[in-house]
């Protein structure tokens, strides 16, 4: 019985692994641009091709509608359910949030019910065509890594074109045509991606798969990216070396999956029958609840991350490259022509780094903190020597230990690094983090570790309170001084003045005029336990 269970679990694991492995393999590599390796000559940099992780690119886009006033609700209007032209009690009103359907609802989270969606005005001006262009712009070159998925809240359109731009919207090329009747709408024979091959993968087709009218289970339109990958990598995308080889050597294939903008052209809404019902035009409109576009910044295999700042995407370039797409060599690193990285050989690829110009070795890039540098052939890089102004690093771009970056100063400012000034009595060491905060000892707080936490007082650093006149009282008439010691009357001694001084001399008795020592108080017992764990105090 146990053997059969083991075999069943093993079979399940093998099945899951075989299914998941290709998808982990597809996008799991090229996430490191360089790494230190050990050779006979010592530690050296190993440069590799690298790219950002695939992500949801709708977070970074700008959407534009044409005509601009095509969204419903201004003025308010009623519309009918597609499946029932007599149910016209739905209302779109742009001035009421609960009834408004603005464009941003195409990109929000769709985990709730009812779903949110953008909606156009109805076809009230029939027979004038009801046509809408929805343009998605990134102001940056991106590479598509998964299917484009458009979910309609209304019926899928009878006619639609998905277009792409590679030059920020100046020119457009069709990606795919969609129609209930391709021959009638676009004079094209209907096809599906399954009809293509390696040799025809770039063919622009018209498909009738996604334009079958309204149905609750038929709301989605795809542009199949992964099916096209599969022509080279196999049905489960196992042979990525083949796909990467094609992307490396075939510019047209690489450009096919690359865009700066996408445009959805809605040419005819879902009618549901051959003829338009002119008595119920309020049932004809477009409504989109979700658009999914997954991809990554195109960085020419010279970066692993892409910054989004001031509504703009920019690659964080490595390999001595620069530009929004890492598309050129940095100044003084033009010793050979710029080249994109290469996916091959699998799995690390080739970095094709930019190397220093022969004339640039004497012109160091040290942000003005040094005029000396050295080209290290083994590391294939230039390193600044003798950085000043408390800086360090390959380009004097970092701060020395015990200093932190001045956020208000440029990298070439002499005051770019500020001393941490950690209090030596309250801090563990003299170093601080990037915000100037020091690492404090127990009981100490503050940016420079010069303040005490409650229950502690400053005395050559923060020490636990001995007395506080609240919980820990000095006894027998003693007075608390600065929370760190009790000043006792002449006849008493001890931390809380709890002992008779005569006890130390062994002279307590009736003759001395001093009685037996008082019984310990709860406060004294508490203090004794605290001090027992905190260690000896110095007075």
UniProtKB/Swiss-Prot annotation:
Pfam families, per database record: EGF_laminin, EGF_LMN_ATRN, Laminin_N
Region annotation (NGL discriminant loop III) ranges: 273-275
Tissue specificity as recorded in UniProt: Expression is restricted primarily to neurons of the CNS, particularly in the dorsal thalamus, olfactory bulb and inferior colliculus. Isoform 1A and isoform 1D are the major products in adult brain.
Renumbered residue ranges of the record's region NGL discriminant loop II: 208-214
Annotated membrane topology: Lipid-anchor; GPI-anchor
Domain Laminin N-terminal: residue ranges: 46-296
Post-translational modification: N-glycosylated.
Protein name per UniProt: Netrin-G1
Lineage: Eukaryota, Metazoa, Chordata, Craniata, Vertebrata
Name of the gene encoding the protein in the UniProt record: Ntng1
């Amino acid at each position: 019985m146990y053997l059969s269970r083991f075999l069943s679990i093993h079979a399940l694991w093998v099945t899951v692994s075989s299914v998941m492995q290709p998808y982990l393999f597809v996008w799991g590599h090229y996430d490191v641009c360089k790494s230190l390796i050990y050779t006979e000559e010592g530690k050296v940099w190993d440069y590799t091709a690298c790219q950002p992780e695939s992500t949801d690119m709708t977070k970074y886009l700008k959407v534009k509608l044409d005509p601009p006033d095509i969204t419903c609700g201004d003025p308010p209007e009623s519309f009918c359910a597609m499946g029932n032209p007599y149910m016209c009690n739905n209302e779109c009103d742009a001035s009421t949030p609960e009834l408004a359907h603005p464009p941003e609802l195409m990109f929000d989270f769709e985990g709730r019910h009812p779903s949110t969606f953008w909606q156009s005005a109805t076809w009230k001006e029939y027979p004038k065509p009801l046509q809408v262009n929805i343009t998605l712009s990134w102001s940056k070159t991106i590479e598509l890594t998964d299917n484009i998925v458009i979910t309609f809240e209304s019926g899928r359109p009878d006619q639609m074109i998905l277009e792409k731009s590679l030059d920020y919207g100046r020119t457009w090329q069709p990606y795919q045509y969609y129609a209930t009747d391709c021959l009638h709408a676009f004079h094209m024979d209907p096809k599906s991606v399954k009809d293509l091959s390696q040799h025809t993968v770039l063919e622009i087709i018209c498909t009738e798969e996604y334009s079958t009218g309204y149905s609750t289970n038929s709301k989605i339109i795809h542009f199949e990216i992964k099916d096209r990958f599969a022509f080279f990598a196999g049905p489960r995308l196992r042979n990525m070396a083949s796909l990467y080889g094609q992307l490396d050597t075939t510019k047209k294939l690489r450009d096919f999956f690359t865009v700066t903008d996408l445009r959805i052209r809605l040419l005819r809404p879902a009618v549901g029958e051959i003829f338009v019902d002119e008595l119920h035009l309020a049932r004809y409109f477009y409504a989109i609840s979700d658009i999914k576009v997954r991809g990554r910044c195109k960085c020419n295999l010279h970066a692993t991350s892409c910054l989004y700042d001031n509504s703009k995407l920019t690659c964080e370039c490595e390999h001595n490259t620069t530009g929004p797409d890492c598309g050129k060599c940095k100044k003084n690193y033009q010793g050979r022509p710029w080249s994109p990285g290469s996916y091959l050989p699998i799995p690390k690829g080739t970095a094709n780094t930019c190397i220093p110009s022969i004339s640039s070795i004497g012109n160091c890039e040290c942000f003005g903190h040094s005029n000396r540098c050295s080209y290290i052939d083994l590391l294939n890089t230039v390193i600044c020597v003798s950085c000043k102004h408390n800086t360090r690093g390959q380009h004097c771009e970092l701060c020395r230990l015990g200093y932190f970056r001045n956020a208000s100063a440029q990298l070439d400012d002499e005051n770019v690094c500020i001393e941490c000034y950690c209090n030596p009595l309250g801090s563990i060491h003299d170093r601080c983090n990037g915000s100037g905060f020091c690492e404090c000892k127990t009981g100490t707080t503050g940016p420079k570790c010069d303040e005490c936490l409650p229950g502690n007082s400053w005395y050559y650093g923060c020490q636990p309170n001995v007395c506080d006149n609240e919980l820990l009282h000095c006894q027998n008439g003693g007075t608390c001084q600065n929370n760190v010691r009790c000043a006792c009357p002449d006849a008493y001694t001890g931390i809380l003045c709890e002992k008779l001084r005569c006890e130390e001399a062994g002279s307590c008795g009736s003759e001395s005029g001093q009685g037996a020592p008082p019984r310990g108080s709860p406060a004294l017992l508490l203090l004794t336990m605290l001090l027992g764990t905190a260690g000896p105090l110095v007075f």
